[in-house]
């Protein structure tokens, strides 16, 4: 047990203790969260993982501690999907890329052969939908982050805007131009049925 009286001297409210052991080529990480004022344990967890996953375990522990102390979900074990740009002004190369929220583990997901725009995660943060132009024709793609597998959801006429997932992750919502005006459509990812959900003379995006 920690010496709570020492931590009270500096008015600490919470304290984390932990240890890391190397067992059978794996890391075992244990930690405890303590309430200093009440002098009692608030949480105790242990994780076993391969050594190169140590950063991920650190992020998971940070999320657990953050949620226990604040009541809100942590964001440490999250990733950012973005469009990377490089090259001269007249020949910009855009690639789909992903990194941890703290900037580590940056990885390119596309080669830069085509223009890519507006990447969006699904609710589980395992799939990404994005817009790309193939021979100047807009296409909506689905990409599995873990396997690298991607598929074309559909080719759409005219201008296409910002595909994204529905809150349940079962549909893609997008805007594209048809018959001279833009409306918002949904596509069911299971049966690929497209349904128009707006019908206004003005532009809907």
Locate predicted features.
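A flexible loop/linker signature enriched in serine peptidases of the S9 family
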Residues: 73, 85-95, 111-114, 131-140, ...
